[in-house]
């Protein structure tokens, strides 16, 4: 397979992310595993390798500049590992938990962690409402997991004091924000431009009050 090095590096530059060559290689190896396992595990509807670079790698990495201050991140409904795996590669100092209730998907995620040697990643097979970690998280994220109100409802017990939600959304989620329950405040909604992706993206930062 081609590794799309130029496309990936150009995208990283546009996102203002400075990664080392070993980190870029890890991203490429992750992409190769995603392509391979997707043939039988249906991890993503996107089959074209070149589209995966923008839709999965760069889209996930667009989250990284907005995680400053966090030390423990939970990726809820991680699926094929987005955004958790690319984020963990870009931020080796960040402890990342990948949570999904689908055994096939977490089998894939464990294989990725094993093959790439990612010591800062933990894979958990569980339903989010049943998950009871020893330590809570100061950053909780998701990509296409659920509407914001449901996302917060299911994860409140996992959020550390002074933690933040950083939810990845497409178009500006006016209706979802309006339906948020009391005790949840939206601190900012950031428009994000993903290289190679002709679609709206927004990050919604929320805190518990």
From Swiss-Prot:
S-adenosyl-L-methionine binds at residues 77, 82, 128-129, 143. Its main location: cytoplasm. The keyword Lipid metabolism does not apply. It comes from the Bacteria. It is found in: Cytoplasm. Its EC number is 2.1.1.170. Keywords: Cytoplasm, Methyltransferase, rRNA processing, S-adenosyl-L-methionine, Transferase. The keyword Oxidoreductase does not apply. One of its GO terms (molecular function) is rRNA (guanine-N7-)-methyltransferase activity. It is an enzyme of class 2 (transferase). GO terms for cellular component: cytosol. It catalyses: guanosine(527) in 16S rRNA + S-adenosyl-L-methionine = N(7)-methylguanosine(527) in 16S rRNA + S-adenosyl-L-homocysteine. Belongs to the methyltransferase superfamily. RNA methyltransferase RsmG family. Specifically methylates the N7 position of guanine in position 527 of 16S rRNA. This is Ribosomal RNA small subunit methyltransferase G. It comes from Chromobacterium violaceum (strain ATCC 12472 / DSM 30191 / JCM 1249 / CCUG 213 / NBRC 12614 / NCIMB 9131 / NCTC 9757 / MK). The lineage of its organism: Bacteria, Pseudomonadati, Pseudomonadota, Betaproteobacteria, Neisseriales.
